[in-house]
Amino acid sequence: MNITTIGRGVIGGGLARRWERAGHKVTLLGRDGGDASDADVVLVAVPSGSISVALDKVTGLEGKIAVDATNAYAGRDEQYESLAHEVKAHTRGPVAKAFNANAGVLYDRIGDQRVAPGCLYAADDEAQVVTRKLIRDAGYEPENVGGLESARALEDFVPGVFSKLTLAPAFYRFAAPGQL
């Protein structure tokens, strides 16, 4: 799969390395933007206050599947239901909210775990299959919390829960008894 990441930092760069190891072709774009025409899917991994600015500098986004990994730490544009909906307004394609509840500083330690850690995600129907594949190819187990209408709850969950954890950054996994 051809993946373009918009953002080359801890999240964008870290996921790019994991996906390249899984056999994907990854193009990393930074602040200057670029072209995503060849991408099958686009990862948005920029500060939340920079989503529109970053996406305005990228051509070839129209109709692409986009995975939004942003969190609202840098604020949000309240004209959108969620940050994922802000991404959707720019790409006009299927969108998933994923990887925003996973600590990028731990990407290199995923393989050391006894079981695959979880990755919460919310996605449009048309983005479900690709999103689950990218989550698994990054080393996580997908944990679906619903359609894109659930993206705001997932965005609000992260600062509300993870900022309170004394063990953060941490892996997590939701499983029924006996599954771990």
PLM features per residue range, with description:
Residues 29, 94-100, 143-147:
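General beta-strand structural signal in soluble alpha/beta enzymes
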Residues 33-65, 69-74:
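Rossmann-like NAD(P)-binding element
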Residues 70-113:
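Rossmann-fold NAD(P)-binding glycine/threonine-rich loop
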Residues 117-180:
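Active-site-lining helix/loop region of Rossmann-like oxidoreductase modules
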